[in-house]
Amino acid sequence: MWKEINEQSKILFNNCFNKKLIVTCAESCTGGMLASSIVSISGSSAIFKSSVVTYSNDMKSKILNIPLKLINENGAVSKIIAYNMASNVLNLMSADISIAVTGIAGPS
């Protein structure tokens, strides 16, 4: 997964740099891997604003203002929660683009 994240981060960096766009992230199961990959690119401060890691449902609610009822009804690993993570971090950080990652970090 790390290799793919790094490859996609380079593409993201080039696109955002050329268009002068600022990006922010909300991550769950990746635990900051996406943000780490982006900031490892030379010049990333030109495009990267911030990131939040909301691993638990409680933090998704407290930091990203996603109602626990919505999480409980749909599951943390759902399209609507990913959408809310992206939308709410975009508003929170006043960036141009946001990326959200949610999933299951299980043993398999």
Identify the residue ranges that each predicted region occupies.
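Short alpha-helical segments enriched in small residues
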Residues: M1-S108
